[in-house]
Amino acid sequence: LSEGFDGNIAYKQRIGEVDLTVRANMTYSKNEIKEYDEENSRYPYKMKYGFRVDQARGLIAEGLFKDYEEIRNRPSQGSGIMPGDIKYKDVNGDGVINGDDEVPIGATTRPNLIYGFGISAQWKGFDINVHFQGAGKSSFFIDGFTVYPFQEKSWGNILTDVVGNYWSLGINEDPNAKYPRLSYGGNSNNYRASTYWLRNGSYIRLKNVELGYSIPKRFVNKLHLDRVRLYLMGTNLLTFSDFKLWDPELGSSNGQQYPLSRTVTIGLTVGI
């Protein structure tokens, strides 16, 4: 079952010698799975029925283990668990952390809200156009080599954000550290989809700004031209988001895609 709305609005007004246009658009949708061919589960949260399409799912992280005593006194998460590893909530209370403890978390992995708004104005020969765009009500997981340094015994650089923010024995034993302990090789416990790696995909971006000046006709006509306009245009100038590691508009889990470029262009338009 899906429902939502899509709309746009524009308002034009002349104020003195200024021609002003304000515009906005928005697409919003929500859905719920009412019928799905799946086996019944003893845990209703494991089923798709009753939840949203593309609902993010994973374990509920409860910080990092501080010592071996805490590891022994917590539900089993498998072998090889060490201080600094992510600890998870035993949702079904069976004393073991496994797939039965994965629950719907966050929002959907596709934005349920997409919007934009802007303003345009003309005054004498000058003009300006500003446009913002954004997305909301979405979640995504960060993963891969970007946030799991040295996985599978690989070599490479570490993000600046990881350096100084990961759990380290005797250096940074904060149970709420931004990153778990580093390990050379695989660490399946820390790589699991969970609230630890879940991020808010909402953002708003200053997508386009254009400033222009059209030379008066009385000068242009002397050059046997129809019009001449100078302009300065910027694209992807500012982004406002809680997520700072890479461009949230990419929808990337690891930031390894080529980012959208910030560009500034100076141009001249000539009409013959």
Give residue spans per PLM region.
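C-terminal beta-signal and terminal closure region of outer-membrane beta-barrel proteins
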Residues: 1-2, 43-69, 162, 168-174, ...
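Transmembrane beta-strands of outer-membrane beta-barrel pores
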Residues: 3, 13, 26-32, 123-125, ...
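Hydrophobic, lipid-facing positions within transmembrane beta-strands of outer-membrane proteins
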Residues: 3-7, 113-119, 126, 206-209, ...
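Repeated loop/turn-to-beta-strand initiation elements of outer-membrane beta-barrel proteins
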Residues: 5, 17, 125-129, 218-219
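Membrane-embedded beta-strand positions of outer-membrane beta-barrel proteins
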Residues: 7, 22-24, 130, 230-232, ...
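Conserved small-residue
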Residues: 12-109, 149, 157-160, 167-172
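Outer-envelope beta-barrel architecture signal
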Residues: 16-22, 113, 124-126, 202, ...
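Extracytoplasmic gating/loop element in the C-terminal half of outer-membrane beta-barrel translocons
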Residues: 135-229
